[in-house]
Each structure stands twice: as structure tokens, then as C-alpha cells.
């Protein structure tokens, strides 16, 4: 029986109007129809609850904007596109808000055990990706300029001063020693090294003797390191000009000598033994770097060298970029600690650049006139390969169109790669 009402009342279930109006009276639908409508509305509400629109916050929107800026800078201004596009897109993926419940796991997010992103992210957390990237770097790096002028290795070491000074600065900001060590490595401008050391020291799992848990800073540190790597052409020139005169920037250097094949083969072997004995904790990075270089220089493993320097490093770079980007979820990334990390990272990068330049000027005090070096190449001791060397080359051509410094600058540049890995190993040995 359909009951009738003299007035039109609304029968609402889950926000849905139920019934039909006829001749000024409201009649209810049958029970089946009521259940169908109720079920449909309930389904729509469930759908809405699971959508990103129901769970989005202003923090998510800010991070989406950051991801879009990364992608824009990579495409529009060619700022490290191989890094910033995967990271930027990963930030977009990581900041799609999803339904959260204690007893409900969709296995979609990067921090949800068993999800695809979480499995891929283990390459970052467990420190698998950085050594594989070092393998590719070694397979594509020519150490001839460093072998021909070994004293320039000191410039790569001088640039690491930014790491240790920033370590003290991070302690002053109130970070725990392991966190400070992970933040300090940003000054090396070496993304893989920064990720490797932060996965060991600032992974959110380590516990201090007083019971305090170390924060998970992998995402902020990685984003800061790669951001400053992309901004090398913006950050370094003002620092170099501030610390050098026009005459110094115009200084010419003797052409590097020719390097024999035997020297090229011996270098990765001797280099591994020397550096790994100094900093055994950096063996995963140094071992893969020199192994990749031996593949290149031996002349009998070209296929392996080509795979390491092309397909392998490209795949790992994509996985590393997209997982690091996805790990920067709004609730994890937008914290006061992240702002402090970016400030310390910028300071570390500037100090490293200045340390390399001042180290070159100090070396000139002890060198004969014909052997003096252009102090600008000291800035290439920052291990953003080959961007720092290109900055020096560009500035040299601006001062003197016939003065080519690229090959000279590559010596401290590749030395900086080794130096940052050694510095990371030293920090690990003190802080683990």
C-alpha cells in the first residue's frame, strides 16, 4: 500500500530524496525501489570517499605545483631533464590523495608494504640504485685529464670542505648527528651519493642510544641535492666571480699530456685500492665506479661498458627519479625540517664551490708561473658531472673566446665524484 501525505515531506536516506509527488501529495516508492536508490547513493558516496577530491588538502596542491615546476624547468630551460622530469612526475604520483584507513590497505602508495611503488622504492631505501648509477658513471667517464695532471685531485678534495662545514651547521640547527651527516653530503652536488648516505643514516629506522628515532629524510635530501645539481649554472658563476679577478679568469693553462692505455687501465685498479682502504664504508660506490671504468678502458668489454653507460643507467635513473619523487608526499615533505635542509644544502653548495676556488688559488702560491692554474677550475671540484666543468668552460670563453678550459676542469670534476664518495664513507664510519 502506498501511503499518502497531505503535505510534501522529504524522505531522505543518505542525502537522497525518496518518493514521487503527484497532485500535491507525496507517495513512497516500493521497498525494492527504495533499496535500489539507497544502494546507488551509498555506492556514489563510497566512490567519492575513495576519490582524490574527497581527500585532497592544500599541502597536496602545493606539492603538485612543485612537481609541475620541476617538469617546466626541465622542458623549458633544459635544467637536468633526465633527472627533473622523472622526479617531477614522481612528485605528482606521490601526491594523489588516497583513502586512508587503519584496517584497509589498497597497496597503492609508496609507503604501503606490498605496493608496486613500495617494492621499487626499496632500491632507494636499501641503497641499491646509487651503486648501479655509479657503475654507469664509471663506464662513461674518461679520467685522462686527471691522470695527466694528478695534482688537480686536490681541488676535488678542497671542494668537499662544504660537506664537513655543513655537518656542523646541521648540528647547530638541532639535527641529530646521523641526520646532519646525511644533510651535509648535499654539498657534494652528487645525488646518488646523497641518497646512498641518507638511506644509511637518515632512513627513519635508526635509533640513537638515548632512544630517539632518526627521521626519514631521504626524500627532502634527494630533492635538495638534485635541485642544486640542476641549478649549477645559476649558483656557481656569482661565487666564482666574487672570488676571482678578471686576470685570473683569463689565465691559460698548459695542454694536458697524452695518457697511455696502460695508465688508463691501472687507474681504476689503483684508485679502488687507495680510496677503499681510506674509506671502506664507501666501497659500494667506489667499487662500482672503478669497475665501470675498467670495463670502459680494458677495451675487451665494450658491450658491457655500453650497457652500463646507456641502458642500465637510464633505467635506474628513471626508477630512482620517480620513486624519490613519489616519496615526497605532502605530510612527509612539507615540514620545517625540509626547509632547513634546503637552506643548509644551498649553503653547503656555495661553500663547496668557494672551497674549490680558494683551494686553486692556494695551490698557485706554490706553483711555478708556467704551471699555475686557472682558479675557476676549482669550482669544478663540485661533483656535478659534467655541469660544473661546463660552467667553467662557459665562463672562460666569456673572458677569452680562445681559452678552452673544459678538459682542465674535468680533472677536478671527476675527482669530485671520487671525493664525495670518500667523504660519504668517512661520515658513515663515524656516524653508523
Residue ranges, per PLM feature:
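N-terminal alpha-helical transmembrane segments of multi-pass membrane transport
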Residues: 28, 33-106, 112
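Alpha-helical membrane segments and immediately flanking helix-loop junctions
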Residues: 122, 126-127, 134-140, 155-165, ...
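Entry/N-cap segments of selected transmembrane alpha helices
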Residues: 143-167, 224, 331-357, 409-413
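Membrane-embedded hairpin module used as a gating/binding unit in multi-pass transport
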Residues: 224-300
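Transmembrane helical segments that form the transport core of multi-pass membrane transport proteins
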Residues: 272-360
